Amino acid sequence: SPPHRPGIPHRGRQLLRQAFQPGHVLLPKVAQQQRCLRALGAGFREQDEKLVVCGAAGDAADAPTMDCGESGSTLRFMMPIALAVGQGGTFVMHGRLAERPLEPYDPIFEACGVTRTREGNTLTLRGKLKAGDYTLPGNVSSQFVTGMLYALPLLPGDSTLTVTLPVESAGYIDMTLQCLRESGIRVESIGDWQWHIPGE
């Protein structure tokens, strides 16, 4: 289950939910996600020890490079987001991050015609995530579910997301849903671990 006090997982989700929303908000710094979101066109400025998130500052570069450090959550969150707000990009991985599994995304990206190229410690995705009906396994990291829950509301058109049983990290999925709802993004439960997600 997730931590009871706001820690890095909650802060990262706060940053992601605000990055492409209009307006300004103060949030704690989350370095890897800030770098990646800036590459995708989100605007930030620093004030004291926090970030002022200004919302989308412009279009993402055609093929942005996003340094994920050694953070598996950053990589898994940013992959679908980059395909939603742009045409993908190149993800730089450090340490053992390149060994972390990413296969749960494969059927989704293949259905959208997304290409994936791996060279050493870099992974390049090219294409566009599309609204649709998607399924993810629940017996792997909830980070894949979080990535899709953040990306799908950014697309034109409505989507559904289903997580198959058993669901191992339910608390973290609930944390993501709470952050989305606090940001005014509607995610409607239509069944056990199944949601209807309106697009833009």
What is each PLM-predicted segment?
Residues S1-E200:
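Structural preference for solvent-exposed beta-strand-turn elements
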